[in-house]
Amino acid sequence: MKRREVLPLIAGAAGIVAGAKVVAAEKSPAAPELRRVSYQSARTGKERDYFVYLPPGHAQKKDWPVMLFLHGDGERGDGKGELDYVLTHGPLFEAWCQNRDLPFIIISPQLPMFDRGNQPYIKMRTPASIPARRAEGINPRPNTVTGDVRLSEPMGGKSPDDRLPDGPRGLTQGWYEIEDELIAMVDRTVASFKGDPKRVCLTGLSYGGFGCWYLAAHHADKFAAVAPIVGYGHPDHAAPIAAAKLPLWVFAGGRDPVVPLRYFYPVLNRLEALGHPEVRFTNHEDLGHFTWVRVYEGEDLYAWFLRQSRA
């Protein structure tokens, strides 16, 4: 079933005007839907699309929790024919491609390519790498973390490295480039699809993990919880996050050669020094950069998100 509806989406500096098209849906009104929402990007000057996933039973209730997902460097694209690459990893892969019942509205935008199209992992990708949707849903997944993962002891002995290779904006040509557009997407999705503005969570992997820290620091009052995966923050991010008491669950891979573990500690130590009451840090010591596969496969991150709400 496919249909098109016009959503008046006008949002400040982002200058967004959008429509939404059902990409795919089952005939049952209780079935999940995947929609493409069009907007005019102020940053690129072109029309682009982003995905909005609506969970099973969406039409029967309101005040759904909302999740903004920021992908990694390898899923960049033109926001049109290349948008499907954002289905490759993360919560949208789990909810849509794996046909998994995740009770969130999921917003999944695509970062523009800018001049990073020559990266080997981008040049090597093909449409064949885009996963198809499973005909039948998967069984509930297990938790991936056990025990209390809140910071319980000083981390100064964890080999912190205060000489970070990146400034507060994170990696070059990252998600900060479309900051206003991302916030506009959240606001419009909440207004148009029965989202709960007090339960908007943020997560991302690699480049998206860096983007999570940036958005959390600059829009701490927007989110109920944030989970950056294999992306570290800058110590300058700590003060606004701590002031807002924004819950964080940070994930790293102990064998990650791309985003070294030692770079996570400066911001975590700063948050601890500021007395932030809700910081979790999980290091999957046996995993490398693809730590996000285990994290997003598990149930515990989603269960934690569902417990969070802004006052």
Identify the function of each model-found stretch:
Residues 14, 19-66, 74, 104, ...:
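A domain-start/cap signature at the N-terminus of enzymes
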Residues 70-71, 252:
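The conserved beta1-alpha1 loop
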Residues 75-179:
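Active-site machinery of serine-nucleophile hydrolases
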Residues 181-197:
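Conserved acidic catalytic loop of the alpha/beta-hydrolase fold
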Residues 198-240:
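Primarily recognizes the serine-hydrolase "nucleophile elbow" in alpha/beta-hydrolase
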Residues 245-252:
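Catalytic His-Asp charge-relay segment
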Residues 251, 257-311:
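C-terminal catalytic histidine-bearing segment of alpha/beta-hydrolase fold enzymes
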